[in-house]
Amino acid sequence: MMRGVLVIMRLLCLGMLFTGCAGVPNSSAPQAIGTVERPVPSNLPKPTPGMDPDVLLREFFKATADPANRHLAARQFLTQSASNAWDDAGRALLIDHVVFVETRGAERVSATMRADILGSLSDMGVFETAEGVLPDPGPVELIKTSGGWRIDRLPNGVFLDWQQFQATYKRNTLYFADPTGKTVVPDPRYVAVLGHDQLATELVSKLLAGPRPEMAHAVRNLLAPPLRLRGPVTRADGSKSGIGRGYGGARIDLEKLSTTDPHSRQLLAAQIIWTLARADIRGPYVINADGAPLDDRFADGWTTSDVAATDPGVADGAGAGLHALVGGALVSLIGQNTTTVLGAFGRMGYQTGAALSRSGRQVASVVTLRRGAPDMAASLWIGDLGGEAVQSADGHSLSRPSWSLDDAVWVVVDTNNVLRAIPEPASGQPARIPVDSAAVASRFPGPITDLQLSRDGTRAAMVIGGQVILAGVEQTQAGQFALTYPRRLGFGLGSSVVSLSWRTGDDIVVTRTDATHPVSYVNLDGVNSDAPARGLQVPLSVIAANPSTVYVAGPQGVLQYSASVAESQQGWSEVAGLTVMGAEPVLPG
């Protein structure tokens, strides 16, 4: 017997990211990832008679990245009995720095596994980052067979090789309707399919299966059961190849449609169209239900223009332009000149945080008196841009406000109490309604120093203890709101986050105390990456963003970064007119 340490491989760092042939056991639960039946891809490893046990283990973990036919590629490395016993269903773990400690004999090898956890992949294709050391899953045992070494015992579940995972899976985004019916909400998924022509069917099937569990009560799914696909998605003319390529379009035939409401049918189409369009499956999109067009106006096919009102990439209130707080008052930027806005928000001093409404026509602003003193007092004011304002909340401290799609303003009072302020229909006076944040407080105790709602209003991103915490926004049957399913994003950011803003519905940008990387991005999966730092001075404070531009408050005033400029010119530049110490950017949201 001999003992040895085998380092399987060092997988890629998460960085810029943006599970003889053994049979499949009948008792194993089905794997929802990659439900398309297809042959094992030729680029995946296969066991060979002369393969050494350490090599076979390494190749097995590569093969687990392909879930097709219930991990058939990986099962080729197992004995029949091991394949019968292996339950590959459920959440898979993505691991890094994998080390096997072997105990080797002539006919049998036993290995224990050590690894770092990078994240997990659910059976719905939901990827979430994580960190920590993999708990001991139990030994992996190999035996020598007539066909070479095979795995005869292994832990249940799937451990994914990150590098092979990247080669096998592609990130796609499903879209569900927000509760107000005004837009669609992203739900990123990782899908493993062989060809482009299978992808459309896979994505529509996932829409029919519904949102991830934590979104189930935060969004609407117009494709919920009993609605189902009548057959695979085809080209608009019914052919099975070239789907969504050129002008061939895509045809989706549904059955058991129950809704007759035109707006609901429009939202149903929007879910399908944005899901396929964002996956580069081009229209026109012929959508039929029970043998007839979903909408007679679009019998020949829908385009993205037909559902433009729900476009998830549109910047809220783009026409309002950039505003800022300068010297405690709200100013607007016109060209390279600033003008103090008319009305209450131009007159009031000591404003410390503000946001324009999603339409850009209203303002919510926090006034803080005796900032930093023991008797500090803060108040929230809401009103029309250029008009008068109404006091809507008060406390010792208030966070920067954030607007929801229903024109409610969310703030954190005294660091822990989340509040919605919304005008009462009868009087027009603001109602102050507490938000249930118990789930957040129990898992992530500590002061909430920033809270910003996603543009669709279904998620809240918070800064707690310098970390980015994401929670769902759910409305209860009683009409109250709650923050649910909180989880941490961006483990690589540590506890350095100061302020955050939603750049898109899937992408958050943050300022940090890290002088080397003072601005970073993090997406809904939890993957973080660093923005360029050229031109920035630290410390940075408030950040505000839209899909095209990121603005930060720094020692020299407000700076901006736009990825749309030439790469040679990319970097942070001063915003003319806002090069004033203490100036803070203000955008809709």
From Swiss-Prot:
Annotated compartments: Cell membrane
Any Pfam family matching the protein: Gmad1
InterPro entries: GerMN (IPR019606), Lipoprotein_LpqB (IPR023959), Lipoprotein_LpqB_C (IPR018910)
SUPFAM superfamilies on file: 3-carboxy-cis,cis-mucoante lactonizing enzyme
Alphabetized SMART domains for the sequence: Germane
GO cellular component term of the entry, any: plasma membrane
Keyword GTP-binding: no
Principal subcellular localisation of the protein: membrane
Coiled coil segments of this chain: none
Lipid attachment site numbers (S-diacylglycerol cysteine): 21
Signal peptide: 1-20
UniProt topology in membrane: Lipid-anchor
Keywords: Cell membrane, Lipoprotein, Membrane, Palmitate, Signal
N-palmitoyl cysteine lipid modification positions: 21
Family note: Belongs to the LpqB lipoprotein family.
Full protein name: Lipoprotein LpqB
Organism: Mycobacterium leprae (strain TN)
